Amino acid sequence: MAKRHKHYENRGSSGRGRRGGRAGHRGRGGRRRYAERNNSERAAPVWAGSGDLGNPEMVDDYYFGRQADRRLWKKDSMRMGGFRPGDMGASEQPQSHLPARKRPVTFTLARDVYDPSHNLNQLLNKQLDEGAEEEDSNSSSPSASGDDEPEGEYEPNPEPKMYRISELNDDALFFVDEQGKLPTKIPAVEVAQQETPRSVEFNDTLTVGKVQLQLRQDSNGGTFVDAPHAKRIFRDDLYGDVSEEEDEPETPKTEQLDNSKSVRTMQPPSPVPQLLSTNIGRLTLSELASESESDTEKPTAEAGAEPPKGEPGFGFLDEDHLADMSEIQVTNIRLGAAAHSYFVASPRTFGDSVARWVDHDTMVDIALELGLPEGRLHAYLRHVYEQLVPPEEPADDGADDHYGDENYDDSEEDEQDDEYENDGLIALVEHTLANDPYRNRDYNTKSLEYRGHGSRKRLIIDKESMIDETVRTLLEDKAAQRSAKRAAKRHAKEDYIAEEARMSSDLFRKYPYGFHIENIIDELEAFLVSPRAALEFPPLDPHGRRTLKNLACAFALICKQVGQSTHTRVLVQKGGRYEPDYDAVNRIRRQRRVFMRVDVRRPRDDITPREPRAKFHVREGAIVGGDAPTIGQDNVGRRLLEKLGWTHGEGLGVHGNKGISEPLMARVKKNRSGLRYTE
């Protein structure tokens, strides 16, 4: 073996490859090798010097580094310090090779300070400068001197004066709206219009029987019934124009106020909290009850409270007519636990006709402002409550009288009722049993018997029975109707199942008995465009399975058999190609057309019965057609021949060339003896 020279050692790889490339390049059996360097070789440490030439004590540090790091150097030499004087090791390792998540965060001081109000300040200063320029231009007047100024000489524009926001007054910065916001919704005020007098007399009262209706007339002359609102209070003047007696002295207004104030008496505060805190041990139930009753008393009258005994209702006293309460229209009320609220419209009080909710105290103030005496305030609120809240109907206690404490003994009444019900019942039963011969007779209650199945099912009725012909016919008709109804229900159910199976994707349900060749082709075409991956056909005979395989191959499908014996099925799967060969499909379509399933039997109704073939028995030597009748007179051909001159028994043809008059006879030959003479 020849010795290899040294210049071959670095070529290729050091392995067993025979034809390696150059050193450091790829070749057979070798790969590129790079010098592996660690982090210490990539970035050698640089020692920092922090000396200062102005300080004699730190000159050594400037050239040779800090005293603490000087021990790392081999020796103190000017050559080592002269490479980077003053900046020895000041540079740090570059961070470019580090990933972003490991790089240190650096903060940079912004050149300009961000001020959000800077633009606003500039805009305000610009507006102030423009206003100052306008004032200067208005105050300065044009020069009236006739001396023309030399061309080219002009006064320079004055520099704009800068203002600070802190030096401006509030009038320049803020706008005071002294006018206020205009109201968007102006309340409407109803103004009563005086009706113009008419020349025609109008009667505002219509009497229908015992009922009087108030009529009104509009501006157009139309008449209508003045029906009051369902929830509006209309106070009628019960006394009419009743004038007070002149002799009766008038009570001053101050006395009325004193009398009205006497109704509302202020009670001292209850000492119940003090008793509960100090004398809780000596407090009795009676004292607590009395104190609680005193607390529940209200200083003002409520609308739903019961009126004092003997107090007349609102409208029955002269004091009720001192104030015009028709100016208050109350259309609704909200009941509360402590006080009620009212839906009130009062143009005199509110200045408009808009209804609004007011509390109890406001309602009292409105009534008092109109001049209603305070003593009749309770009656007025009670009147409002009764007009708006329907009265509660008292419960009928008559139905619960038998639940009272008294005990009634009704045993005697029950005995009398039993005697009355049983009166004559025994005699009626005895008479019925004596005169009814069919009551105690036993009858055979067995079910009816039928014979036959399906449409030939008939009812069997014994002729020896006592049933007459009418009842027999009725029973037969009922039995036939019952059978027909059952058959109709069965057919409807079968039709429903067949319809559901027709829409199903399962071929076993869709084709319960067999296929036509067109059905198979349609199913394969639908399978190509459907998302299904496989299609299974019901069991067919061997020739049907072979035909199905040929069709599957024509449609570029994969076909295989599944199962055994009569349950052998054909499973069709999709392949990679979906382009059918319709020429092969049309060739198969012209072959066998019907394929029946071998795993099910057809019902008897679908089986068409075969007609029996007629059997003819002939004997040896019989004349063929010897028993056939002669052609009658009504035959068209015979009548045509007779018109041409032919007669019965005459041969056909012209004179001198007529045919035979007797036809040739053919005899039946069944044996194999050959031609021979037979008598």
Curated annotation (Swiss-Prot):
Which keywords does this chain's UniProt record carry?
Cytoplasm, mRNA processing, mRNA splicing, Nucleus
Where does the UniProt entry say this protein principally localizes? cytoplasm
The GO biological-process annotations, alphabetized, read as: maturation of SSU-rRNA; mRNA splicing, via spliceosome
Superkingdom, taxonomy of origin: Eukaryota
Q: Which PROSITE patterns match?
A: G_PATCH (PS50174)
SMART domains hit by this protein: G_patch
According to the record, the residues making up region (Disordered) are 1-40, 76-161, 242-315, 391-419
Report biased composition (Basic residues) as residue ranges.
16-32
Q: Would you tell me the Gene Ontology cellular component terms?
A: 90S preribosome; cytoplasm; nucleus; preribosome, large subunit precursor; preribosome, small subunit precursor
Q: Which Pfam families match?
A: G-patch (PF01585)
State the function annotated in the UniProt record. May be involved in splicing.
Please give the family membership noted in the entry: Belongs to the SQS1 family.
The protein in question is named Protein SQS1
User: What organism does this protein naturally occur in?
Assistant: Eremothecium gossypii (strain ATCC 10895 / CBS 109.51 / FGSC 9923 / NRRL Y-1056) (Yeast)
